Amino acid sequence: MINTRILNTLGLLLIFLGFTMLPSSLWSLYYQEYNDLFPILKSSLYTILFGFILYSSKYLNKAQNKTDFTSNDAFTIVTLGWFLSAIFGALPLYLSNYNISFIDCFFESMSGLTTTGATILGGSTISIESLSHGLLFW
C-alpha cells in the first residue's frame, strides 16, 4: 500500500503546478486569444483539483506514524512527481484546438519542465509560431 504522505506531497506539487499555469491565462487574456484561454484555465483547474484529492488522502489514514521519509519514499516522490507534472503540464496543449497528440504534448511538457529545449513542434504537424501567446508562455 502506498504511503499517504507520498500522496500528500504529490498533491502539494500538483497544486503548485496548477497555480503556475494561471499566469499563462493572463497572457491569453492580454492578447485576446480566448480559444486558448479556456484550455489553460481548465488544465489549471483539473490539476489543482487532482492535487487537492491527493493532498486530502492524508485524512484517510490518521493512524499512520510520523516517521521521516525513507529513501524509497523519496525515489517514489521524485519519479511520480516528474511523471505527474509532465502529464498535467501537457493538458493545456492537448486541450487546445491544435490537434496535437497526447504523446507529443507529453514530450513538449517534459522538455519544458526539464528545460531541455528539445521540441517536436515545427515539423509536419504545427509550427511553433502558430501557437498562441498563452501556450507559448506555458
Region locations from a protein language model:
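Membrane-proximal intracellular helices of multi-pass ion channels
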Residues: 1-138
